[in-house]
């Protein structure tokens, strides 16, 4: 720790400025008010596109970093308000239009639904039989499972949450207005990183986890224990009364009664005395370390989850006391940065991390890039944990929800990581001052960019040629009727020995790292089959040649995505082709007339290309997950204990050829969506076709040039002039960048909605 004399701590002073900036709606009536050229109003149709492109580009409105910071801060409150309204809608649907109580009573047979279609012109065909006499649309968001884990036992509680979320939305909107128009933080407040770290670590994460642990201990754990006992057919008795249904469970405030809780968890009778006397073992019945899954619900033990949040809280509250603020003790981020000098042999940046502190505290794009990269990676990690360590009751046997949650978190992660590339490039163009980064680590990376990119390119070629080559070989051998010459588990076997070793290590490590645990970290790692209601909740995942092959396709596509994004960042300011790129900005179509071959080279264009490869990459990831789970994990458990998998284990033999992926996965599993008309999944059939159309529409923007459209427009304008109906606003073809933006947006929207319909129609029927 860097300890310094007391005078090094800065004195506390007001970091908020009283401003008189009246909140008015007048500006809403002046489109383009933020830009002098746009404020004059539209002369051509390009105006509306520039309006959309620049409305949120605060850097373009003003160069005052304090003003930009205040706008972003205020917008965050607006964003939170929208989130609370969205949450309120989810709670309201659960309270008003759902079969939540019916699902709670029989979660293994009743399907979750929170929407019923009104019969206006025959749409009621979409209302499927959810069980227990309820007709509706099946939801796959995991909300019911999450609500049960929270301890919600009735629709009345959901309605209270819906109202509470609206109140919170109102508070957030008010805070957003107040902190921009009345009392706005000064720039130094936004740049006070030590205070921010202390508050975010100890406050948001530490006390946030502690308060959630309190909820889990005092509400979730007792409620889920009572619910689990009902579901297991062995209801518990509280105060002499048998708790036979959700309606019998005490309301959350009744659990303030320590004696009531002690009947479920005797550790509560120890009170807080055990905490202060160090007798923490007294709490071991509600702060557990069991490991594995609850056999009744197929989810993590609620008492393990409580223990986890207590531990996280302790860690982060400690972490929130590490940084130097008004007292001269603790870490200084600037000193930590400037203390990093690099390795003279491996990384000879003589000035180490000098200049990075100022870059990260003056460039919000640089800060955002780091946060998006981390946030995106965390989202992808969450996707993996949702099936390997399912946290919510009955989530693991709701296969449509499991595919939905995996796909959702994978795609969110992909978009955030591409966003990281975008904002890193913007930071390089707008905020990077070469004079402040002489021979530091960032400067050295930029100097080595040719070596980095050419090596990464070589890796991509190697991975692509070899991984695709394995498939080409297998397709050729299968086409020629030579299965004995294929790469497969039964012929030329290529086992993923490293992945299998990791599985074994995880399975074995739990015994030494958590000796009192009852089970391992995850059943996926060489565990055992956990069945709930006759369905597989979790099971060991066998890995073989097919997994080895598709994993190297993943490696290839992910490396190409990284190559595109990293090249965009490292060459954002200059390149051999365009040495003065920084002067042209983040997005430009070409380097002016007379410079052939300089189009589509801006940092923006790298983000554009990166989005396609991100989509490519993650489509294969979600297809792999969906097929692997249906083939080797998910299914029904027979009376003799054997498992009948949904696709009968066909992954190992079919996923080793391209034809197998097309025939036994895409085509075989598209049966339900193609044949959905007239059934309750018909909407997915229409969506499947509609999304294909949106995808095809995108190609019109991606495969034709601007000149083509300008010629067409001029011909159409001529016809309008002939009829004397010429528009006052002159029509213009989209610019190259506008056209590519419209194209990629529809490409991704069409692709994602097609996949959504394909997954849902199939798994809702077979899952």
UniProtKB/Swiss-Prot annotation:
Q: How is the cofactor bound?
A: PSI electron transfer chain: 5 chlorophyll a, 1 chlorophyll a', 2 phylloquinones and 3 4Fe-4S clusters. PSI core antenna: 90 chlorophyll a, 22 carotenoids, 3 phospholipids and 1 galactolipid. P700 is a chlorophyll a/chlorophyll a' dimer, A0 is one or more chlorophyll a, A1 is one or both phylloquinones and FX is a shared 4Fe-4S iron-sulfur center.
Kindly list the positions annotated as binding chlorophyll a. 700, 708
**For this protein, what reaction is catalysed?**
reduced [plastocyanin] + hnu + oxidized [2Fe-2S]-[ferredoxin] = oxidized [plastocyanin] + reduced [2Fe-2S]-[ferredoxin]
- Stretches assigned to coiled coil: none
Mainly resides where?
membrane
Q: Which GO terms describe its cellular component?
A: photosystem I; plasma membrane-derived thylakoid membrane
Give the residues the record marks as binding phylloquinone. Answer: 709
One matching Pfam family is: PsaA_PsaB
GO molecular function term, any single one: electron transfer activity
Q: How does it sit in the membrane?
A: Multi-pass membrane protein
What are the TM regions of this chain, as residue ranges?
A: 72-95, 158-181, 197-221, 305-323, 364-387, 403-429, 451-473, 548-566, 606-627, 681-703, 741-761
Keywords on record = 4Fe-4S, Chlorophyll, Chromophore, Electron transport, Iron, Iron-sulfur, Magnesium, Membrane, Metal-binding, Oxidoreductase, Photosynthesis, Photosystem I, Thylakoid, Transmembrane, Transmembrane helix, Transport
Q: How would you classify this enzyme at the top EC level?
A: oxidoreductase
EC number(s) on file: 1.97.1.12
- Gene3D superfamilies under this entry? Photosystem I PsaA/PsaB (1.20.1130.10)
State the Gene Ontology BP annotations: photosynthesis
Q: Which residues bind [4Fe-4S] cluster?
A: 590, 599
Where does the protein end up? Answer: Cellular thylakoid membrane
Chain positions recorded as chlorophyll a' binding sites = 692
InterPro entries (alphabetical): PSI_PsaA (IPR006243), PSI_PsaA/B (IPR001280), PSI_PsaA/B_CS (IPR020586), PSI_PsaA/B_sf (IPR036408)
Say which family it is in: Belongs to the PsaA/PsaB family.
Q: By its UniProt entry, which PANTHER family does this protein fall under?
A: OUTER MEMBRANE PROTEIN, OMPA-RELATED, PHOTOSYSTEM I P700 CHLOROPHYLL A APOPROTEIN A1-RELATED
Subunit info here reads: The PsaA/B heterodimer binds the P700 chlorophyll special pair and subsequent electron acceptors. PSI consists of a core antenna complex that captures photons, and an electron transfer chain that converts photonic excitation into a charge separation. The cyanobacterial PSI reaction center is composed of one copy each of PsaA,B,C,D,E,F,I,J,K,L,M and X, and forms trimeric complexes.
Task performed by this protein? PsaA and PsaB bind P700, the primary electron donor of photosystem I (PSI), as well as the electron acceptors A0, A1 and FX. PSI is a plastocyanin/cytochrome c6-ferredoxin oxidoreductase, converting photonic excitation into a charge separation, which transfers an electron from the donor P700 chlorophyll pair to the spectroscopically characterized acceptors A0, A1, FX, FA and FB in turn. Oxidized P700 is reduced on the lumenal side of the thylakoid membrane by plastocyanin or cytochrome c6.
**Name assigned to this protein:** Photosystem I P700 chlorophyll a apoprotein A1
Q: Which organism is it from?
A: Synechococcus sp. (strain CC9605)
Q: What would be the name of the gene that encodes this protein?
A: psaA
């Amino acid at each position: 720790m860097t300890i310094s004399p007391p005078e090094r701590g800065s004195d506390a002073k007001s970091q908020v400025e009283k401003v008189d900036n009246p909140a008015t709606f007048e500006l809403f009536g002046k489109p383009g008010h933020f830009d002098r050229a746009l404020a004059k109003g539209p002369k051509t149709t390009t105006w509306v596109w520039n309006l959309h492109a620049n409305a949120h580009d605060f850097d373009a409105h003003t160069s005052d970093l304090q003003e930009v910071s205040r706008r972003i801060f205020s917008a965050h409150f607006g964003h939170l308000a929208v989130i609370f309204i969205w949450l309120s809608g989810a709670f309201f649907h659960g309270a008003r239009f759902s079969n939540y109580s019916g699902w709670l009573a029989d979660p293994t047979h009743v399907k979750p639904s929170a929407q019923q279609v009104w019969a206006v012109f025959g749409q009621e065909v979409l209302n499927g039989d959810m069980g227990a006499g309820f007709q509706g649309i099946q939801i796959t968001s995991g909300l019911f499972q999450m609500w049960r884990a929270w301890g919600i036992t009735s629709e009345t509680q959901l309605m209270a949450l819906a109202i509470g979320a609206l109140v919170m939305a109102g508070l957030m909107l008010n805070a957003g207005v107040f902190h921009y128009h009345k009392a706005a933080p000064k720039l130094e407040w936004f740049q006070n990183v030590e205070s921010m770290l202390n508050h975010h670590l100890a406050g948001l994460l530490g006390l946030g986890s502690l308060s959630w642990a309190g909820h889990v201990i005092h509400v979730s754990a007792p409620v889920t224990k009572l619910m689990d006992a009902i579901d297991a057919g062995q209801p518990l008795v509280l105060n002499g009364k048998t708790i036979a249904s959700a309606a019998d469970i005490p309301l959350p405030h009744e659990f303030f009664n320590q004696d009531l809780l002690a009947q479920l968890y005797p550790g509560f009778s120890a009170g807080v005395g055990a905490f202060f006397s160090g007798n923490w073992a007294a709490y071991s019945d509600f702060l557990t370390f069991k490991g594995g899954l609850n056999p009744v619900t197929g989810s993590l033990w609620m008492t393990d989850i409580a223990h986890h949040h207590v531990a996280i809280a302790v860690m982060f509250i400690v972490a929130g006391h590490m940084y130097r603020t008004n007292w001269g003790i603790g870490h200084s981020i600037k000193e930590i940065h400037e203390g990093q000098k690099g390795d003279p042999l491996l990384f000879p940046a003589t000035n180490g991390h000098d200049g990075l502190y100022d870059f990260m505290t003056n460039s919000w794009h640089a800060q955002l890039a780091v946060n998006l990269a981390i946030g995106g990676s965390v989202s992808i990690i969450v996707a993996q944990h949702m099936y390997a360590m399912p946290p919510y009751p009955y989530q693991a046997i709701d296969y449509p929800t499991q595919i939905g949650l995996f796909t959702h978190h994978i795609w969110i992660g992909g978009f955030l990581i591409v966003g990281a590339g975008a904002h890193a490039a913007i930071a390089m163009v707008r905020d990077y001052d070469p004079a402040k980064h002489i021979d530091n680590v960032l400067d050295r990376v930029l100097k080595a960019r040719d070596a980095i990119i050419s090596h990464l390119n070589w890796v991509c070629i190697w991975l692509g040629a070899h991984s695709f080559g394995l498939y080409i070989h297998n397709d050729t051998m299968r086409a020629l009727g030579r299965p004995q010459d294929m790469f497969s588990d039964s012929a030329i076997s290529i086992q993923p020995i490293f992945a299998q070793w990791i599985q074994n290590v995880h399975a074995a490590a739990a015994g030494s790292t958590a000796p009192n645990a009852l089970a391992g970290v995850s059943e996926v790692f060489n565990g055992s089959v956990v069945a709930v209601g006759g369905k597989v909740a979790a099971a060991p995942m066998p890995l073989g040649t097919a997994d080895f092959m598709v994993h190297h396709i993943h490696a290839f596509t992910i490396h190409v995505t990284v190559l595109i994004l990293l090249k965009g960042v490292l060459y954002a300011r200059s390149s051999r082709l365009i040495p003065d790129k920084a002067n042209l900005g983040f997005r430009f179509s070409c380097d002016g007339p007379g410079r052939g071959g300089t189009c589509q080279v801006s940092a923006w264009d790298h983000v554009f290309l990166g989005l396609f490869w991100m989509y490519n990459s993650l489509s294969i990831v979600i297809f792999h997950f969906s097929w692997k789970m249906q083939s080797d994990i998910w299914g029904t458990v027979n009376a003799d204990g054997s498992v009948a998998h949904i696709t009968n284990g066909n992954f190992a033999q079919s996923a080793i050829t391209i034809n197998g992926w097309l025939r036994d996965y895409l085509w075989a599993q598209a049966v339900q969506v193609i044949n959905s008309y007239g059934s309750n999944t018909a909407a997915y059939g229409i969506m499947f076709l509609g999304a294909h159309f949106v995808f095809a529409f995108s190609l019109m923007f991606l495969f034709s040039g601007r000149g083509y459209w300008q010629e067409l427009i001029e011909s159409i304008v001529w016809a309008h002039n002939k009829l004397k109906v010429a528009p006052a606003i002159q029509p213009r073809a989209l610019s190259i960048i506008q056209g590519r933006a419209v194209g990629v947006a529809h490409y991704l929207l069409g692709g994602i909605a097609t996949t959504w319909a394909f997954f849902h129609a199939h798994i809702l029927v077979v899952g």
